[in-house]
Amino acid sequence: MAFLMCAGPARPQSPLPAQTNQPPAQAGGVSEKGATGNPNKSGQDSTSASKPAGAGEEAASTRKLRLGPLDPSTPPTDVPHDRPIIGLALGGGGALGLSEIGVLQWLEEHHIPVDEIAGTSMGSIVAALYATGHTPEEMQHVLTDESVNSVFRITPPYTALSFRRREDQREVPNAITLGLKHGVSFRNSLLTDSGLNELLDREFLRYNDQTDFNDLPIPFRCQATDLNAAKTVTFARGRLQDAVRASASIPGVFRPFEMNGHEYVDGAVLENLPTPDIQAMRADVILAVSLPLQPVGKGDLDSILGVLNRAFAVAIENNEAQERKLANVVLIPDVSGFSSTDYLNTVPLSKRGYAVAEAHKAELLKYALNDQQWQQYIAHRAARIRGPAGTVLSVKVNAPQTDLKEIAEKRFAPLVGQPVDTKQIDALLAQVRGDGRYDADYTVGYDAEQPDRPILLVTISDKKTGPPFLDVGVNIAAQTGGVTRASVNFILLDQDLGGYGSELRTKVDVGFLTRIESEYYRKLGRTGFFIAPRAGISREPFYIYSGNARLSERLLQQGGTGVDLGWSDGRKQELRAGWQFQNINWTVDTGADTLPTYSGNAQKARMQYTFDSQDRALVPEYGVRVHTDLGYLYAAPNSTSAPQLFTELDSSRTFRKKNIFLLKAEGATMFNRDVAQPFRYTLGGPLRLSASAIDQYRGTDYFVAASGYLRRIRSLPAPLNTSLFLGGTYEIGQMRSPDAPTVSRQDVYFGVIAESPLGVISVGPAIGNGGEHKLVFTIGRLF
């Protein structure tokens, strides 16, 4: 992971001269390094062919900046004239850049002003926060463990998913998603960017999409790498969130930031320390915080990723050595013991930054102001901080489909006339993104006549790689002396087929269970109602037992079709009712038993309800999930018709962060009707009497209940956000049937449970009161 936190190799670049007499060529929005041109009186480069800011992409504000994204900018003019202008350059380095907060704290405590600031990568986030008026103490509250965990996510939170995507994640919790729109393609980043976007939108809400960065409380610049032009660019105006988002787009970790047909990634790829930007802003004194090249550790070069990581770091260091030469004072914090992924160590890393500033005290104090000058500096900076945003003036939505646009407008309409609530906006955007079909973000602008009332521009766009999408995962359940059930699972999804929200979902399982099942989910208007025809075939082995002795292996082959009419709120619940037709073959494959072979058709009328408020598909920490199926089996030859009722309840509750209490209850009844064997329920296996073999007991009426306790013994940091648990369960269950003795069992299970990219991995022994005992191992679903 350390490799992912480093930018790519640097391109050699000559340092700029110490004195510059011409205005620097920096972007309006973005400017290329080395561009030339003389601004005219309006601030527009007379030789520029670029369009005004926002051209090619709709802007939220009604008032536009005169300079376009690639037009040169001028140095700030609202700077001190009675003392040296002090500029600060903050370099990138992943989490190690958090040490820069401590440097800022030391500078403030010793009355050393920062008149201009620039940053790259993590340095751009710290620099932008400081430039907009955040104190070092406030930054530590912004960059908390909670916010870091929300930024570094491999997948969206389970609670942000739509109902159908939650179903998919529960079935294949370890899925790798492939896009099939342009052949087979993986996504272009390890992490999702919604958490990063939400953090930046929240902190920079007051600054709209037409901001001149010279007008911030501290004039600001940040760098990014233009992948199309293979150049470093400097953001000097436009939307502050976009500038920082581009600069912090670690290649391979976050997807590139796209603007006007160009894609931008971490500025550290070509220029990690933005001292040239500070020089171009005409600072008299340049201070720089540069993160050191870490020594090679034991085993660092023993893998491909380790070698790549070191190669990138060496390339960056070579270029950064030249950039340090432009600074009057270079601060290199001692960050030994930390890595570029230690984002949960904001305070300890800040202390390292404070310490390096203290070590350079003699060099820095000559730039300190007296108390009166410092108060004047603070007052001037505070006067440039924008006040809180007023109530929302309007919401505009851009979307690729008319239906989607109208639905989004309806969802966002209640925001008009209300104070801006970024959490509410993020929740609404999550609803748009929750089906996995679209990307969504928003921009804040202002009207020229009502400059204190924000305009929200919501932009919804198609994902580049799909639909269709293909999820691929595995599920394994194994027991000693029992059965190993392993399958590779596929979910093929073609969305908006026949209209917004409609989809064709095909599930394919290969392994112990072989299955192909397709459902066309067709929305009926915008009421939440739907119709869902389906068809499928399956082949699954079942083992027949007498007590604990296995008698035979039978094969259940099914093929059928059906249709449901239902309603869903799209988030937590779904109700459906329908009919299904099945053709069933139930035959002996190996061994011998006394059960009759069955072949024939059957029909079933059914009603299902599902409610899901749990927070995770792996090990839920809170919430409830209830699934109920009420049906009537009929028209089955050589079998009694029977009503059927099945209910499953899962509940989780966390106490003091490390203790999770689980309750699982499951039961079904055919009201003791003597139905044919292939229609009967089964019981046994992990968390369904764990000490018994999988599906060991067969009958018409059963229940099983399990209460469990998990103790979190270790938490893995972002982006994995997973945990390792020790725990156990107590299970009690019973199986009844009209033609066999009732079986009652009690089990205990204890073991290790780990959340992982492969799903839940569990291993542990189970002991039952009937002489049963098993060692249980699972990968994928939690039992």
What are these regions (language model features)?
Residues A224-D226, A236, P333, V397-Q401, ...:
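Flexible glycine-/small-residue-rich
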Residues G434, A440, I455-L457, P467-G481, ...:
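C-terminal outer-membrane beta-barrel translocator/porin domains of Gram-negative envelope proteins
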Residues G8-P12:
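Sec/Tat signal peptide C-region and signal peptidase I cleavage site
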Residues K423, L428, D435-Q608, Q614, ...:
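Gram-negative/organellar outer-membrane beta-barrel architecture
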Residues Q13-A27, E32-T120, A128-Y442, Y446-D447, ...:
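Patatin-like phospholipase
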Residues M1-C6:
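Bacterial N-terminal signal peptides
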Residues A288, V330-I332, F725-T729, V760-A766:
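Conserved active-site loop/cleft motifs that coordinate metal ions or position small ligands
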